[in-house]
């Protein structure tokens, strides 16, 4: 899916430039976006308007931008440089909408902000799925059995919007393996995954943190084609 998107972007860039000559420079502006923004409460980060490229991450758009948050949300602000700041007392799950007026009205963009507290959802972020697995009550680390359906060796992202995906995000090798929504039960240390691509049955998992919050062990509570019985994925960040 991501590969198809990359090829589509490349063809669109080429076609636009061929049709419009020097106006091909409008491609970045016409395809610019803000996207979704995840930010921990009590922190700041720089927000940028970006545009897609065929074989890699998005690039910052070189243009004048006027930033605003509408409607206003208490404790969330953005300055004229695009620096987004969220106060520490903003509740977990709070959302806001950022607006960007690009080049005095040539483009008007918006993006959603999701505020989270790591102690209320420690999964949020991008993890790399180790090629090994953890098995048994002692979490013995060993080589995994070969499987054509494997998710190992990819990245696994949990988002504040309660969405997840497994795959590679950038470069010509971009690939989506699994995506959908998730529900976290912090007290029981369990996760419910609802895959929407490809469509699969809901699955339930237990999780365990090791090495502080740097290693995450995900173990299925139902049989999984990709894992031996009693084994789980090792996720690293």
Describe each model-derived feature in a short phrase.
Residues 2-12:
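Bacterial N-terminal signal peptides
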Residues 51-55:
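Short solvent-exposed capping/turn motifs at the termini of beta-strands
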Residues 19-36, 40, 44-46, 56, ...:
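Lipid interaction determinants
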Residues 75-79:
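Short beta-strand segments within Ig-like beta-sandwich modules, predominantly Fibronectin type-III
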Residues 15-17:
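Boundary at the C-terminal end of the N-terminal hydrophobic targeting segment
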Residues 61-65:
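Solvent-exposed loop segments of extracellular immunoglobulin-like
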